[in-house]
């Protein structure tokens, strides 16, 4: 559940970054931002990372206020880990197509049809789905977590079918997959990937495991956003075709300014494939959220208590 406020009518300060820094001190706040946020937000964040890193930071912060520049399931996770702290999300409409693809009631029925199965849910899901899960995972640790389970343990993996299939291939484990997907990674075009490879024959193809198999089979490296960033920095390659949300390219260019990064387009005429939900957050909205102490993330106590256990299990197994 989210607490909304009317759009602000006041004038923005001229020095927006300076005003945000002042509010951060006043509130004893920390700004956590995902790699898919706009560059201006990435540059002002106290911690920038992928879902695993952001969860670890949320679990360990001593700040009184958490300003989460990401999407709602990320802010929910921060609230679950910090039930007594103020957690702010700049735009309440910053949802997630993957999380939306797994409705709690339908998933509960799906779970009942597969008794004796342990439920591993990708962190890109709602608090209600987390509460129905045994272990949460991220793209950084999904393979590692599955490898720690007994070989005869039956597994449900939700909600991303592409990540689930990738984990099955990496571990050799059979899993029952919920058929959800991410609109960004689902719509990358193999045809346009091959066209780019012809245009940039020396380019390495790096891709997120949420991509379809048609994309991953061409990849030189597959990994989480953090893994892709690290690989691009260490590789001797000079050109990279990037198969994930292009927000990460800002950090890739900062890490390796002499290298070229080409965003993989989708099937439309767009030359990139931005997440429309991630891009709802702006520096201006972040300022208003801090200035007004709202919109605040709130969740039922019972849901938070149930969802906390699988998150803690993930952190312990990572």
Swiss-Prot record:
Cofactor(s) required for function per UniProt: [4Fe-4S] cluster
Protein name: Quinolinate synthase
Family: Belongs to the quinolinate synthase family. Type 2 subfamily.
Catalytic activity: iminosuccinate + dihydroxyacetone phosphate = quinolinate + phosphate + 2 H2O + H(+)
GO biological process: 'de novo' NAD biosynthetic process from L-aspartate
Gene coding for it: nadA
HAMAP family recorded: NadA_type2
Organism lineage string: Bacteria, Bacillati, Cyanobacteriota, Cyanophyceae, Synechococcales
InterPro entries hit by this protein: NadA, NadA_sf, Quinolinate_synth_type2
Stated role: Catalyzes the condensation of iminoaspartate with dihydroxyacetone phosphate to form quinolinate.
Molecular function in Gene Ontology: 4 iron, 4 sulfur cluster binding; metal ion binding; quinolinate synthetase A activity
